[in-house]
């Protein structure tokens, strides 16, 4: 990428490997952001899908391995690690979830580990995975983003899944009438039926915005933090390619400093996503407003 400008380098690293309907009528991979944009809605971010599935499988395999090797005697390092993680998540669920459900704890564990693994890919040097993709494909211009959580499609997809569970449990616990009443009869109420009828549109607007804000904030918080972190790594990488010795030296220091700080960010963002999911589902299980 030595021939690229700093701007071109940054744009290339922030572009997804997109598969879809090309302008010439064929199906294939986009090589530029303009081609990807022309593909429209029915385009697939292959890198995001691939890494999300791969890291999900890694999570399943690690925990399956730990379960198969679990023993009541002297536990190994993997069993100790998994037990500590499970106890941590279980404690978080017990502290924040006030309903009864056998699904919430496994869901919270899955979310925390999966999001953490997707975030952790950000610690891999920014050029390694794209360069590997170029070597495998034989195309020196093909884009490839490895951090799935820097793609709003991934974070919004996870958030919408949580939103679907919120709606499902709200209706299951409160009934369809109770769910509709929650959206239309609160926060403002009146014993006068005429006044209450007038307040329904206001209540619905306020409650609907509150409801929709949950998945949007959940998705954008994770995306924004991880996208900003990835951008910092890319800007530091630009320093290395500047050709200036002092700037390259500064880049080395910043790379290590930001990587250490980023470990906190990737863990914290996974924890926040998990905790908000637990809190939102706990609210859905509450039988009163």
From Swiss-Prot:
Subunit field text: F-type ATPases have 2 components, CF(1) - the catalytic core - and CF(0) - the membrane proton channel. CF(1) has five subunits: alpha(3), beta(3), gamma(1), delta(1), epsilon(1). CF(0) has three main subunits: a(1), b(2) and c(9-12). The alpha and beta chains form an alternating ring which encloses part of the gamma chain. CF(1) is attached to CF(0) by a central stalk formed by the gamma and epsilon chains, while a peripheral stalk is formed by the delta and b chains.
Family of the protein in this entry: Belongs to the ATPase A chain family.
Keywords: ATP synthesis, Cell inner membrane, Cell membrane, CF(0), Hydrogen ion transport, Ion transport, Membrane, Transmembrane, Transmembrane helix, Transport
Its membrane topology: Multi-pass membrane protein
Protein name per its UniProtKB record: ATP synthase subunit a
Cited function: Key component of the proton channel; it plays a direct role in the translocation of protons across the membrane.
Alphabetical GO biological process terms: proton motive force-driven plasma membrane ATP synthesis
One term under GO cellular component: proton-transporting ATP synthase complex
UniProt keyword annotation of Oxidoreductase present: no
Chain's gene name: atpB
GO molecular function: proton-transporting ATP synthase activity, rotational mechanism
The keyword Transcription is annotated on this UniProt entry: no
Transmembrane segments: 43-63, 101-121, 160-180, 193-213, 232-252, 259-279
Stored HAMAP family: ATP_synth_a_bact (MF_01393)
InterPro entries noted in UniProt: ATP_syn_F0_a_bact/chloroplast, ATP_synth_F0_asu, ATP_synth_F0_asu_AS, F0_ATP_A_sf
Pfam families: ATP-synt_A
Cellular compartment(s): Cell inner membrane
